[in-house]
Swiss-Prot record:
Database matches in InterPro entries: SRCR (IPR001190), SRCR-like_dom_sf (IPR036772)
Residue numbers spanned by region Disordered: 1-33
This protein's record includes keyword Acyltransferase: no
Protein's UniProt name: Scavenger receptor cysteine-rich domain-containing group B protein
Alphabetical UniProt keywords: Disulfide bond, Repeat, Secreted, Signal
Organism (species): Mus musculus
GO cellular component: extracellular region; membrane
Domain of life: Eukaryota
Amino acid sequence: MGPSERPSIGWTPKEAEMQIGPQPDGWSRGWKPGDRGAVPLPLSPALSFLLLFPLASALQPTPLPFPELRLVGGPSRCRGRLEVMHSGSWGSVCDDDWDVVDANVVCRQLGCGLALPVPRPLAFGQGRGPIFLDNVECRGQEASLSECGSRGWGVHNCFHYEDVAVLCDEFLHTQPPTRKVLTSMAPATALQNGKGEGSVRLVGGASPCQGRVEILHGGVWGTVCDDDWGLQDAAVVCRQLGCGVALAATTNAFFGYGTGHILLDNVHCEGGEPRLAACQSLGWGVHNCGHHEDAGVLCAVLSPPTSTALPPSVTKEDWARHTGPAATGVGASPSRDTVWLTTAARASGKKSGRLRLVGGPSPCRGRVEVLYAGGWGTVCDDDWDFADARVACREAGCGPALGATGLGHFGYGRGPVLLDNVGCTGTEARLSDCFHLGWGQHNCGHHEDAGALCAGPEELGLQVQQAGSETTRMPSPRPRDGHLRLASGTHRCEGRVELFLGQRWGTVCDDAWDLRAAIVLCRQLGCGQALAAPGEAHFGPGRGPILLDNVKCRGDESTLLLCSHIRWDVHNCDHSEDASVLCQPL
């Protein structure tokens, strides 16, 4: 494991940096309800080594009573803003270092099943009163949050707009066996591309093209460790399985813990390899991981293509352009000469006003919502596939489809779930013309909201204009907290990074800014691959507040706000240090 990787015991680099030096009130590495004195816990070899130094005395566990926690402000007891009780009062938890591993512990403690992806900031509002915990760090196996590390009661550097929110799948333990469950471990439902050496399969996902990555070696199936796991690696897996482009590379056993051997670690794909086994790694069976680090993928196509699944008007050439190595979407390498050209003229469509895409980086990428009886509602991802996305994109006036998403990829909707088991041929004018169970008939929750990735009018216009037609640019949506934009560049995919927060636009300081942050931002904005991450106001100094500093990304985060950073508005910069990115335009 190289210097840039996180220690396998579960600490993040940020946490390790914080521990070398004086600690506020002592670093808590676990506590038990009812304890009053310091009770040392078993220490790993790495932590024992640190105890040889004088400063390490600050790392001794400080037992803290932790009788209760709750989720408030959400639609159910299993979804909301996290609060813990201390000394008779309820308080918030700060989101520094918070991830799905920590959320899984909370969900398990509450009897709420599996944690879903970490929601956007302020998803359930801001808390009031004290902030009790910060830098919570769980390994994933803990029975309760009280066994995880933290900085200690009341020690933090946060504000309430950093309050942790948690989404659990409360249906996990009550669903019938036939209903899809995120943690399904049955290999019988897994998609795999063969039984030969180097074959891969996805296990534990809600559809055949999502799940924990397992690979076959020496006749034995094993998992892949998430050290260095990223979107290029996921792209190879999705392509090997015929599942289109990669939407996300998941870490920290997002799709549940595997069993048996860990066969690959530090996988590094260039993105063009035909098989995962062709990528660089430490070698078969060489790793320093546990199954809490099992890698996974989410691919754009929910089900793999078959020779009989293509609608009459879709040629194999069209399908290959959307699912082959050159297909362009989130995280794929762009290829202008193969994407959209053959379908642009007949796929642009006219907006019906009865379907919209929301929650995404542009008006043509997002959660699918349909209008019925005067109200908007969502579509469940049961049977949702590329043909359905084609119709949704056409009805939205957004050109050809690039991919179909599920599992609430673009956030969780509100209100009714209006359609389920949608089955389109791909030629319908409206989504409501496709087969479905009937308006309002479903067995879903909003964690199953379907989405679509469309080429969009901007990109479509490049192709349509070549054919002698005209196109109209869609107006930009009104910004909301957390929205990002690139300013002063020559096109929409390069420029100075600006963030919208509290009804104002502000900039990002270039301290610690690097290509990994650019990768996250380019992906979030629906642009191509990150080319550079210049600092020093490369595109000129901005105005207004400097909202973020010391942004540190791994590169696989879904949004820039999930990267580690100093708390809002705290920095030591001026606008001569504004951060920028250059992304390859699509």
